[in-house]
Amino acid sequence: MCGRNQLFVASLLASACLIYCVQYVTVFYGVPVWRNASIPLFCATKNRDTWGTIQCLPDNDDYQEIALNVTEAFDAWNNTVTEQAVEDVWSLFETSIKPCVKLTPLCVAMRCNSTTAKNTTSTPTTTTTANTTIGENSSCIRTDNCTGLGEEEMVDCQFNMTGLERDKKKLYNETWYSKDVVCESNDTKKEKTCYMNHCNTSVITESCDKHYWDTMRFRYCAPPGFALLRCNDTNYSGFEPNCSKVVAATCTRMMETQTSTWFGFNGTRAENRTYIYWHGRDNRTIISLNKFYNLTVHCKRPGNKTVVPITLMSGLVFHSQPINRRPRQAWCWFKGEWKEAMKEVKLTLAKHPRYKGTNDTEKIRFIAPGERSDPEVAYMWTNCRGEFLYCNMTWFLNWVENRTNQTQHNYVPCHIKQIINTWHKVGKNVYLPPREGQLTCNSTVTSIIANIDGGENQTNITFSAEVAELYRLELGDYKLIEVTPIGFAPTPVKRYSSAPVRNKRGVFVLGFLGFLTTAGAAMGAASLTLSAQSRTLLAGIVQQQQQLLDVVKRQQEMLRLTVWGTKNLQARVTAIEKYLKDQAQLNSWGCAFRQVCHTTVPWVNDTLTPDWNNMTWQEWEQRIRNLEANISESLEQAQIQQEKNMYELQKLNSWDVFGNWFDLTSWIKYIQYGVYIVVGIIVLRIVIYVVQMLSRLRKGYRPVFSSPPAYFQQIHIHKDREQPAREETEEDVGNSVGDNWWPWPIRYIHFLIRQLIRLLNRLYNICRDLLSRSFQTLQLISQSLRRALTAVRDWLRFNTAYLQYGGEWIQEAFRAFARATGETLTNAWRGFWGTLGQIGRGILAVPRRIRQGAEIALL
């Protein structure tokens, strides 16, 4: 007995648990959740250059950052922000040197001679070991005659080409930098046969010569509905799976459009320390130099160069430079405490957690790439106001490494090339027309691009030509995210219908970024502010759109809807598309415009539940990301089923309206239903009768069908009615009493006719009874309505009379009250005036009484 009671209690508890312990999917809108994104960013700049402002929007300095209490993964190399920076800077670079004319006609044999000075003697390059360090006050800086510097090597060439007259050839003279032509090595004559460089490897185009590549600063901004996260950890080295110091921002810091190899110039990441960004899977690094050492480079192209256009043929104008004398060689000198900075780089490298080589800084050295590499790799390649310099860094490396047996200078000679290899696309070469006048440019050195080849005995820091690494240092601590404010979580509450609740308005904090301030809070705490967060999200999106629209309007004259302009305008509608997409998704689940939406879908995994007090929404989202597709599909199916149920319920609701019963369309349906019922009854009766007849025929109560159809019994045998038959015979053949002399087919037809007439009579009686009863019911209803209307009329008359009598009584009471009030006020007023009169007369009688008293006293 006790065991039965325990089993009963256990079953009750299990049933209660099944009813009350079921978890249902609950949809939350406005949760601080995000995922990595890769949409196009738009840029903003303060530069007012024509081509720069076409590419970017004006910068208004209205940007903000907030700290988040979350942990996030960052990777400078697998990063859409840095990849977009590389592509966009290349777009700016390509715009500035936009090619207009193909120089294929110049790929002809030229007869070239080395140029010699007409008025001066060339200064030979010294080959002896020397140590020369120059400063700002050195005289050779002004005269461009520092030790080891010579004159630029140039060649004067002649070639024949059909000009404007196609049937005649014309002789042209052209001067080239020696690095831009390739001459036949087996030609021992003074006059050599040369070709323009790269003629046999790629198509060469000449720049439009509209403007030159000058650096500019700009920043990236996320479209509305998206945000940028930045790793603010001091020890961040380009790859950090668990960055704990994360801030959210709408835009990046300012960055420089750098295009150089070996070194990064004018970067914005320099700090009072040296740090290294190291690729997560190979030896590529970017080293940020300590700005304490004030490292700068000053480059100069001496001479007063002029440029002349040469018309080669119709539509082809080639910009060249005439030779008056051999120009002085371009050169760069390095200012600052370079040796100390390089020592700090070695010490920082030895302490880096990714470094596996020797810790002896004496065995860590800087080396140049192989001489057989591309010129942009073997030399330091940089731009100086439109001219691209290729600087031989041997003297500089000897000076930094203090190689006593080799030439050491803190300046380097540079060659100028006008046919350059583009740094982003392989096999594309552009001819840059020379710039006139003397060119100088000064830059701050902020980083080193290098590959680390470590070993137990020696470590080589090899300078690199990966220009893209510069932007990984500038923007590698950012990542682009898309805010996904829709979250799922299990709760024991099932969907129910209730009146909408008006929540109190929350204060908008920091616009769109204020929505992310609760990212580090627990799920339970964040869920309490979903209404305010969702409004903050939408308000922030609208605010970002308005700001973007304002800057687009300010620049619409210069924008002209270029490719970048189209992207900037597209960024403005991205947020609205995202918001509408979220609302459409919520609507498909039956949760449109709700912050917390309970559903009837059971939770998919009972063992997977959130810790509302200790887990953030971002952590919970990562755990259930694989289940979102199934949850979404289940919610859609549940909503479809609920809509079907609501449709059926609404159809039933129409019956409770009395007027719908008398609708014409309803009566047509009723008639259809009645016809269907009558036809069904007839068919059912026929089927039942046929079945009964078949059963009787099988029992022998009708003649056997095997008799010939044309057979008629000629002799009628009368059987005595009182003669008893044998019991077996009566049971087998049945009772044959009566005048059954008709043939059985005719009798059977008569029987069917009688049954049909009986069925029709019964249907007629049923319909007549139904109509009579309906008429009686309608009469009763009409009588009830008549009595009800009479009662209502009498009640209204009685209450109207009662109200009329009450109104008259109230009016009379008011009139009596008015009369009493008037009389009371009149009497009070009279008494008040009488009292005032007595007081006045008493006051006036005081002198008289005093006089009378004085007279009496004198008498």
Curated annotation (Swiss-Prot):
Signal peptide range in chain numbering: 1-24
GO cellular component, one term: viral envelope
Cystine residue pairs: C43-C56, C100-C208, C107-C199, C112-C157, C221-C251, C231-C243, C299-C332, C384-C441, C391-C414
Residues spanned by motif Di-leucine internalization motif: 858-859
Annotated Pfam families: GP120, GP41
Residues with attached carbohydrate: 36, 69, 78, 113, 119, 131, 137, 145, 160, 173, 186, 200, 232, 235, 242, 266, 272, 283, 294, 304, 359, 392, 402, 405, 442, 457, 460, 605, 614, 630
Positions in the Extracellular compartment: 25-673
Xref: InterPro entries: Gp120_core_sf, GP41-like, HIV1_Gp120
Domain of life per record: Viruses
Stretches for region V5: 457-463
Region annotation Immunosuppression: where it falls in the sequence: 569-585
Post-translational modification: Specific enzymatic cleavages in vivo yield mature proteins. Envelope glycoproteins are synthesized as an inactive precursor that is heavily N-glycosylated and processed likely by host cell furin in the Golgi to yield the mature SU and TM proteins. The cleavage site between SU and TM requires the minimal sequence [KR]-X-[KR]-R.
GO terms assigned for molecular function: structural molecule activity
Keyword annotations of the record: AIDS, Apoptosis, Clathrin-mediated endocytosis of virus by host, Cleavage on pair of basic residues, Coiled coil, Disulfide bond, Fusion of virus membrane with host endosomal membrane, Fusion of virus membrane with host membrane, Glycoprotein, Host cell membrane, Host endosome, Host membrane, Host-virus interaction, Inhibition of host innate immune response by virus, Inhibition of host tetherin by virus, Lipoprotein, Membrane, Palmitate, Signal, Transmembrane, Transmembrane helix, Viral attachment to host cell, Viral envelope protein, Viral immunoevasion, Viral penetration into host cytoplasm, Virion, Virus endocytosis by host, Virus entry into host cell
Motif (YXXV motif): 701-704
Residue ranges, annotated region (Fusion peptide): 506-526
Residue segments, region V2: 157-199
Annotated spans, MPER: 651-672
Job description of the protein: The surface protein gp120 (SU) attaches the virus to the host lymphoid cell by binding to the primary receptor CD4. This interaction induces a structural rearrangement creating a high affinity binding site for a chemokine coreceptor like CXCR4 and/or CCR5. This peculiar 2 stage receptor-interaction strategy allows gp120 to maintain the highly conserved coreceptor-binding site in a cryptic conformation, protected from neutralizing antibodies. Since CD4 also displays a binding site for the disulfide-isomerase P4HB/PDI, a P4HB/PDI-CD4-CXCR4-gp120 complex may form. The surface protein gp120 is a ligand for CD209/DC-SIGN and CLEC4M/DC-SIGNR, which are respectively found on dendritic cells (DCs), and on endothelial cells of liver sinusoids and lymph node sinuses. These interactions allow capture of viral particles at mucosal surfaces by these cells and subsequent transmission to permissive cells. DCs are professional antigen presenting cells, critical for host immunity by inducing specific immune responses against a broad variety of pathogens.
Note: Some HIV-2 isolates have been described that can infect cells independently of CD4, using CXCR4 as primary receptor. These isolates may have an exposed coreceptor binding site.
Protein name: Envelope glycoprotein gp160
Lineage, opening ranks: Viruses, Riboviria, Pararnavirae, Artverviricota, Revtraviricetes
